[in-house]
Amino acid sequence: MVDWELMKKIIESPGVSGYEHLGIRDLVVDILKDVADEVKIDKLGNVIAHFKGSAPKVMVAAHMDKIGLMVNHIDKDGYLRVVPIGGVLPETLIAQKIRFFTEKGERYGVVGVLPPHLRREAKDQGGKIDWDSIIVDVGASSREEAEEMGFRIGTIGEFAPNFTRLSEHRFATPYLDDRICLYAMIEAARQLGEHEADIYIVASVQEEIGLRGARVASFAIDPEVGIAMDVTFAKQPNDKGKIVPELGKGPVMDVGPNINPKLRQFADEVAKKYEIPLQVEPSPRPTGTDANVMQINREGVATAVLSIPIRYMHSQVELADARDVDNTIKLAKALLEELKPMDFTP
């Protein structure tokens, strides 16, 4: 069963892309230092935990960064304008709370919306929301007051925490991408038994702005096998039948050119051995995960993507099923324990 308290703590810890040092990095170090043989932080901010073995050398990566916001203007009335860090849709911000990390500590702001009573003209009835529409109210009445509160050009913000249990197994919260897989990776590492593989567990940085952390970590580690753990899309209303994975049916593994066929077959065999449900997702092009850069590191790496399906990705109400999380932990643990030296040449 999942550790709800630890999972929530990992999800809600601060860490927008490039600012992972605000919270999540040290939390990951504190957890892994008690179980790994060695834990270090590289110059980009990746946390790399080494579980010593012989062969093959395997790198497992789950990104710890979040999409977020940066203040780029404070007007004379104390309102903030913001720009996105990573793939933030402006419409997801309307009437929502934002958590900021200022020089004077955490502050909150709200993105206002024009009340229906004041919408008289057709142009006020809706339409496309763009970044010019996003105005953040932090409770200040002037630029000077906002600055006194600690806000500056460059202040970082993220979706406010809002972890909600919806039913016995399902829950919604901002930042399941990718904190839910980060939790699963950490939990698999904590539960790891005997293993032949030489294992590097990597909490990677800056994935949301270009897979940057995994690129440098894979160069330093030079693994033979690379497994990216990241969320994927689950069937949801109005998806027009384009999405294959479903909630509650288990973890997901891609098939496609970014995936080593022998590693994929090995994963299928392990899942069957341990009776772990495993869904398949077609990926006809390089995935948007850390496996993309791991695969083409140095002389090439045998890569796979292990995913947890979620609904409503990159919103404040990302939704997952705890049974999928639990089965992902079981499969990740089993893969690492079962991995032996083999020829991964396709």
Swiss-Prot record:
It catalyses: Preferentially, release of N-terminal lysine. Belongs to the peptidase M42 family. Binds 2 Zn(2+) ions per subunit. The keyword Hydrolase applies. The active site is at residue 207. The keyword Hydrolase applies. GO terms for molecular function: aminopeptidase activity; metal ion binding; metallopeptidase activity. GO terms for biological process: proteolysis. Optimum pH is 8. Hydrolyzes di-, tri- and tetrapeptides with a lysine as the N-terminal amino acid and with Gly, Lys, Ala, Phe or Glu in the second position. This is Lysyl aminopeptidase. Optimum temperature is 100 degrees Celsius. Zn(2+) 1 binds at residues 63, 177, 230. Its EC number is 3.4.11.15. Its cofactor is Zn(2+). Zn(2+) 2 binds at residues 177, 208, 314.
